[in-house]
Amino acid sequence: MKNLKGIFSALLVSFNADGSINEKGLRQIVRYNIDKMKVDGLYVGGSTGENFMLSTEEKKEIFRIAKDEAKDEIALIAQVGSVNLQEAIELGKYATELGYDSLSAVTPFYYKFSFPEIKHYYDSIIEATGNYMIVYSIPFLTGVNIGVEQFGELYKNPKVLGVKFTAGDFYLLERLKKAYPNHLIWAGFDEMMLPAASLGVDGAIGSTFNVNGVRARQIFELTQAGKLKEALEIQHVTNDLIEGILANGLYLTIKELLKLDGVEAGYCREPMTKELSPEKVAFAKELKAKYLS
């Protein structure tokens, strides 16, 4: 297993106008992250990859393409979580066979699962695959909140490495870091990189890193070095960019920014809006000129 600390892009996926996977474009996005953004790794199959609108076979195809293009140049994490446990296991086995360094799985959602059911879900994926696991906690989308003691229960399984922490509860983040110093935490909110890094997170996984990965690393490393003033200046610029991206449409705007750099980033998958309006394309060009030139 490679070192899983550091800056990981939550990988975007390029789709054709008919919704099919654009393999050429996906390969270009992988290469852009490696060659231009200089990320430490990729988090494949997450929310940014429009994962929860895809079939099992499409998810496998994305895992295959990303691994084939990245090879062993960087670390790879496969997000295999699903409300269907058997699908999660099938995906986990496939990604493990491909050589992914660790699995990750979003907490099972929609139904109000009990904590014992959630623990069984993670333990089952690990037992079936033999791979490592990173809990993906994103309570504002799943409605699932896991407390400090419950994380301790999950961490009793030695294959659970830590958590992708996509939440604004920095008190919980600090408590987890103190209670379980040997387990890793990846910050999941790009706009809060500095405060997360100041609390000692081990890395970050972000959607905007596909185009803003260099600044993300600067914030992370400056904060680790105690250079908070310099880190804050870069966080301010980063958040100005993120504010513009969010106002314009998160995934489509990041894809447009990639297109402006020659990457065939494609469309989004319906029922999301497939492409930006001309006005929003023009705004993306303004963001590119102001923040990414």
UniProtKB/Swiss-Prot annotation:
Cross-referenced Gene3D superfamilies: Aldolase class I
Subunit structure: Homotetramer.
Residue ranges crossing the lipid bilayer per the database entry: none
GO cellular component labels: cytosol
Applied relevance: Although equilibrium favors sialic acid cleavage, this enzyme could be used for high-yield chemoenzymatic synthesis of structurally diverse sialic acids in the presence of excess pyruvate. Engineering these enzymes to synthesize structurally modified natural sialic acids and their non-natural derivatives holds promise in creating novel therapeutic agents.
Protein name: N-acetylneuraminate lyase
Residue numbers annotated as active site: Y136 (proton donor), K164 (schiff-base intermediate with substrate)
Similarity section: Belongs to the DapA family. NanA subfamily.
Residues noted as binding aceneuramate in the record, renumbered to the chain: S47, T48, Y136, T166, G188, D190, E191, S207, Y251
A Pfam family per the record: DHDPS
EC number of the protein: 4.1.3.3
Catalytic activity: aceneuramate = aldehydo-N-acetyl-D-mannosamine + pyruvate
Localization annotation: Cytoplasm
GO molecular function, one term: N-acetylneuraminate lyase activity
Keyword terms of this UniProt record: Carbohydrate metabolism, Cytoplasm, Lyase, Schiff base
